[in-house]
Amino acid sequence: MNFIFNSSMLLAITMLTFPLIYNLAFPDKTNNFPLYCKTTVKMAFFTSLPALLLFINTGQESTITNWQWFSIESLNMTMSFKLDYFSIIFIPIALYVTWSILEFSLWYMHSDPYIHRFFKYLITFLLTMIILVSANNLFQLFIGWEGVGIMSFMLIGWWFGRTDANTAALQAVLYNRIGDIGFMLAMAWLMINNSSWDLQHIFMTNMDTLALMGLVIAATGKSAQFGLHPWLPSAMEGPTPVSALLHSSTMVVAGIFLLIRFHPMIKDNPTILTTTLCLGAITTLFTAICAITQNDIKKIVAFSTSSQLGLMMVTIGLNQPYLAFLHICTHAFFKAMLFLCSGSIIHNLNDEQDIRKMGGLLNIMPITSSALITGSLALMGTPFLAGFYSKDSIIEAMNTSHTNTWALIITLIATALTAIYSLRIIYFALLNQPRFLPMSPINENHPNLTNPIIRLAMGSIFAGFILTMNIPPTSMVPLTMPPISKLSALIVTITGLLIAMELNSATNKSLMMSYIHTHNFSNMLGYFTYLFHRMYPLANLYLGQHIATMLIDLNWYEKTGPKGQANLHSTISSYISSTQKGLIKTYFLSFIISIPMIMLII
């Protein structure tokens, strides 16, 4: 059993390197390379299933140490894979979602001349995330961490001819650099105090609050929590398959996954738990508020991702890492599907992303519309869809905790807002009369478009049930909860849905004569980007100009250099000339008076 378990999972991971090796060996053979990549990921998914089934049946876990990288006096570094609860469940889900995204990319990117390079980047992106998830030491985890960072930069800036895409890619790197500083601080602290980066050794150490705060900063940067969040909506400048992969099962969940991995160190530290709780609550509310007034369909879905990441951070603050992980797994299905549906709509409407210029797509694109509605309902937490099993459990866990009343209230408000912006997409894009140009070449009959969306729709419907019924500890349902606590999430969701229906029908035809401050605050992302991307750089520019002109022109040339020397000598000479008046008679008189006085003294 152990042989089958280890070999199937390692083979699935190794298979992802086959397309990369093939491309290195035969760089000119690119005709069928995208299809080869898609087939490889599909086969890797089926190869990883025996390990998942063995884990479900027997609860088997293992740590595989293959070979020693290097050894110094204070550190022994090995290449080691940790196949435990989190990696065994996450890897098949990531492979399944990526398989669907790669198949969708065959349709979406078919006209791109560098599609083979695009698929190579996507495979590398997935591989680095799997390295991060399965790493058993911090060095290996850091390789995966930096790998997803650099691949996100390459993929967000895929259309490098556009200034916005380049700026968005740079934003992603720069904000993640701040998080990386926190990660490296934690690694340095562990090197000094523990002399080992292996997870099993780290978990026996009492980590300092400062080192754990470094991990929280790392997660804040990578998972776009409040303060380091502006890169996430900007990342929508990349192609839609990139957005789907970035937001579902790679990059953005890496920060949350890091905190889940280090939960044995966090669980007994109230400072860190409170920090993550408050940070997550602020993030989930702020990004939900921003999503309400956006008009770009991809940005609405992006802000919904950020809001769900805030919910996962809240769950870690509640000391519930398994619930946070369950939400990562269920969220991957419907979030990837929402992005693929958005990509289908955008591509069919000649790259139109404004929901105000859509409408009436329910009859024209039935498969995409059905999947979009299913994904939106799952995102809201509608009973018995994927999102319900994790989202409902998170809010129930908050109800049973007594330290976080305000976080509970904020999260419930954000849950209601989720229903509002989800329904807003449905209302504007799918219902009413068409508002797009009549010549749009709408066609959703291609199997590379419909098959991935249908597969992910199946996952969005059944994944939550399958996961919670088969995998502990979520399979053990608490039966002693008051009905009002159990129903609170559902009541809030239904309330938000009703308010959303009323708001959308009331505001659809009304004209806003003048923008109000609350609308501007939401639409302009809380003025965050204006403050940090405009005012600070402008202030730095003025300061730099002032320093340059003061230092070089005024100080050097006028105070110290040629003009300064001339001024210095003219000042000294004028002082001397003013003290020496040339009054010879007066000088002689004083000389004559002083001589008798000196003689008398002597």
Swiss-Prot record:
What terms describe the molecular function in GO for this protein?
Answer: NADH dehydrogenase (ubiquinone) activity
Report the principal subcellular site: mitochondrion
Q: Which Pfam families match?
A: NADH5_C (PF06455), Proton_antipo_M (PF00361), Proton_antipo_N (PF00662)
Which catalysed reactions does the entry list for this protein? Answer: a ubiquinone + NADH + 5 H(+)(in) = a ubiquinol + NAD(+) + 4 H(+)(out)
Q: What Enzyme Commission number does this protein have?
A: 7.1.1.2
Regarding the membrane, this protein is recorded as: Multi-pass membrane protein
Q: Where in the cell is it found?
A: Mitochondrion inner membrane
Enzyme kind, highest EC tier:
translocase
Q: How does it assemble?
A: Core subunit of respiratory chain NADH dehydrogenase (Complex I) which is composed of 45 different subunits.
Give the family this protein belongs to, as stated in its UniProt record. Answer: Belongs to the complex I subunit 5 family.
Q: Output this protein's name.
A: NADH-ubiquinone oxidoreductase chain 5
Q: Which species does this protein come from?
A: Osphranter robustus
